Amino acid sequence: MRFGFIVVTLCSFSISIHGVSLLKKMDFSPPETWSVEPSDALTFGTGHAGVALSKTETVVFEHRIKPGQPTQYALMNHFWSTCTPAAEATLLVRYYVDGETTPSIEFEPPLAVGVGFDDSAAPWGTKWFGIGAGKGQGQAWFHNFKIPFQNSVRVTVQATTTPEAGGFYIILRGGLFDTDQLKIGDVALPPNARLRLEKYAGPLKPLEVLDVANIPTGNSGLLFMSTLAVNNSGVGSLNFLEGCFHMYDPPTQQFPGTLLSTGTEDYYDSGWYFNAGEFRMPVSGFTHIKVEKNLTEWSAYRFHEQDPVRFRDGFRFTWRCGDEVSKDPGVGKCYTQSGGNVVGSPTCEWVQSYAWVYVWPNKN
């Protein structure tokens, strides 16, 4: 998603003048040197309308919290942006939490909303995310993910290739909480929980196992949601959907760990290679499909708000490019690492995965 918009140029040196929030070049300075004062506002955020955006990483929002109760925490809880499809296709959004110099969250808006290949089918949405404008025109992606922090947050945007002219619009919002514990579904999270985005982009060999998420030992947490997108040049078509999801807690747990699905489409609450077509439901969605002689594209998402996937000492969440069936008829698929009968010709020439995981350090 690239932007380089020229409607208004605010790329600047100061984040605010007389209460008006301006853009500035990312400088990785510590929070205590920022021009914004610590705040105890219960609701905070910003909006930028028709601004320029370049290949330079640009701060669009920064916020600091006044010290308060030990149970106090803050959240970023709303993201929305819109622009032309050409610009959106080059955009990266980053969240730097509590003085980070490497962002724990960096996303492309469509993949954050569970959509691969910039599929602009619209409108649709759930309480967590969606797209309100698109259909090949200007797109408007949003999510309401709860991104906790205790002291500070900084949000930046950046075009990853040569920017294109046009207007970029963004709205960011958050809130401060004193005693109301953050809950994801039925799971209450501690004040020091952080949301981390684990990502992968690249090829996989047939039957290769991908760590969609890999959280080291010494950490507890909760898998919130994930997105998977796969394409190939037609070889094997959708045979990669035979791949099974597993979890390992701790990460060194022996195979098969805990089996989370009996095939890829099964994990997304479908079956038979998604024979009923695309869907976008509160828990899971099948958001893109293109199957041609020389091209296969597919993407889907799933949340774990209703069926928490928790871990207590590190975590691996894995997916395999295709799978094999044991030669023992009593075992079936998903429980054989090698030596079985491969189902079809699974081909994963390019894979992108996102896993949003809440993580907090174990108590000593």
Residues covered by each model-derived region:
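Cleavable N-terminal signal peptides of Sec/SRP-targeted secreted and luminal proteins
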Residues: 2-19
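Beta-strand-centric surfaces of beta-sandwich/beta-rich domains
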Residues: 18-364
